[in-house]
Amino acid sequence: YKPGVNTAKTIYLTFDDGPGAHTARLLDILKNYNVKATFFVTGYNNNYNDLLKREKEEGHTIGLHSYSHNYGLIYTSIDAYMEDLLSIQNKVKEYTGEESKIIRFPGGSSNTISRKYRTHIMSDLTSKVESLGFRYFDWTIVSGDAGDTKDSNKIVSNVTGGITEDGLNVVLMHDIKPYTVDAIERIITFGLSNGYT
């Protein structure tokens, strides 16, 4: 997504928390349909580091999510968050050769979980990352796969039911969930058959 760009009839597929055991299958599906996505990656699963390179090589956007995804660590202070962010930024650069400057905060930029660790941390962090040239992105459509939804049919319904023709359609999904990967082909075909890019 770029400010000022017409977003009508566009669906932005975004995936958090990977790469993981199901990411390669997801990449195969995306490649089959020539669809590009944004991956907000983590650093704690070293078994799938090679997929960072594949994501980049296949034309996807790689954003930074968190190295540890440990709320109790990253949301205690600006310094703790920045250390974690720079760690995942360095890892992405190591595997892709590029320094990503786009991020998605774990829980989103207006999450309430972080208050448990420090009040006002999110407003402080959003200001800090922007001052350093980072851009953060949230979402407008929740697939439900981060919570109790483990049924691919429900994920498809959540996503397709949230899409609007004239709005910004940024879908939050997780490539570490097998049921999300099971749902993605139906989400893509819905979008393509209804004239979305």
List each model region and its residues.
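Catalytic domains of cell-wall/extracellular-matrix polysaccharide-remodeling enzymes
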Residues: 47, 69-196
